[in-house]
């Protein structure tokens, strides 16, 4: 049985350099947990709405972050406009994360696809107390056979033993 949605709207977010964007939301009437989702590189947040709707039907409030230069972002990459990971990790993601506060103190997961998953890992590492879970889809990890010995042989063990 799917849950009725209480909110299918958007939250406006922005940072001091003038960049603003829309955080798309799908919030069920009685959410049990929430997810801040980071898209793959070059993919607008709106393409994840079917995922957000499916998760919301299962009781999860979903918030879709928008990358600089994509979708609702007021910026576009050009020779006159440049940004890097510092902008994403220290400005944009904290602003999107802060917009979730109005939905209460639900257990929060962060996740993403591809580059979004890698940046989600970095953001979670910078704010370890903020997230209960990390969701990754096709986010790439270092393949153990690419490393020289002895690290090559220690990595599979580390992958199995780390939480």
Residue ranges and their predicted role:
Residues 32, 40-43:
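Active-site glycine-rich loops that stabilize anionic/oxyanionic intermediates
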Residues 36-40, 66, 113:
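The conserved beta1-alpha1 loop
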Residues 115-163:
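Alpha/beta-hydrolase-fold enzymes
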Residues 103-114:
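Alpha/beta-hydrolase fold nucleophile elbow
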Residues 27-34:
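Proline/glycine-enriched tight loop/beta-turn segments at coil->beta junctions
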Residues 82-101:
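Alpha/beta-hydrolase active-site loop
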Residues 1-27:
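N-terminal cap/lid segment of alpha/beta-hydrolase-fold proteins
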Residues 45-47, 52-78:
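Conserved alpha/beta-hydrolase
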């Amino acid at each position: 049985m799917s849950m009725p949605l209480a909110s299918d709207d958007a939250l406006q977010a922005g940072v001091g350099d003038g960049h603003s964007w829309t955080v798309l939301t799908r919030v069920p009437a009685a959410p049990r947990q929430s997810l801040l989702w980071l898209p793959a590189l070059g993919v607008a947040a709106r393409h994840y709405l079917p995922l957000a709707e499916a998760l919301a039907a299962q009781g999860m409030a979903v918030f879709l972050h928008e990358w600089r230069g994509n979708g609702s972002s007021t910026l576009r990459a050009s020779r006159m406009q440049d940004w890097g990971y510092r902008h994403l990790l220290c400005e944009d993601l904290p602003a999107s994360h802060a917009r979730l506060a109005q939905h209460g103190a639900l257990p929060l997961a962060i996740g993403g696809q591809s580059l979004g998953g890698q940046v989600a890992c970095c953001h979670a590492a910078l704010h370890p107390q903020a997230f209960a879970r990390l969701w990754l889809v096709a986010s790439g990890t270092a393949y153990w056979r690419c490393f020289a010995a002895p690290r090559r042989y220690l990595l599979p063990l580390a992958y199995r033993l780390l939480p």
